Amino acid sequence: MRLKYLFKIQNIIDNEIRRICQEDGSVIDRVYLIKTQILALEVKTGELANITKCYKYPQQMKAVEKRKLIIRYVDCFKFLLSIGNDNQFNVVNFSVKELIESVTKEPCETIVDVFLSLFDHISNLKRDLVTENYISGMGVYMTIFKEFVLIGQLLGLTFEDVFEYYDNIYRDMVHKAEPPAER
């Protein structure tokens, strides 16, 4: 499944970052890591909202170059995947196709509504992870994931766009980290 591949790529990236931090003698405590990941996700999500200018009143959203949107979207997505990996939410076997279909069937909200809901849910996720309430956290994580899919749709992005961009940027890193195939 392609989503599992993205979780795998992000795990390789995160492990390399941790390796470098350990060489520096840095020790990262669990709660600090959660808080920094959540803050990074909020900042990157804010940058995505900013590039769309969806918050400007009474302007209509102006078209933004698709590549810029994908770059900002993937910046958010990386932190979402990292949080999933670090809290074992990556084991949930959900199909991107089913996720997209469920988002499409829901009543259409404005992008502003989705961003606001997303920020609320990100805060809820922080609370659940810091207090080690992983069952609630898993549900909130799935909601956040769904909201990211919806934002992508509202911006005209497909999962294919996101996958291709992510894969093109990080493919070499993954292949270097994988052990050679056995014969």
Task: Give each language-model segment a name.
Residues 1-183:
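Flexible "arm" and connector segments at domain edges
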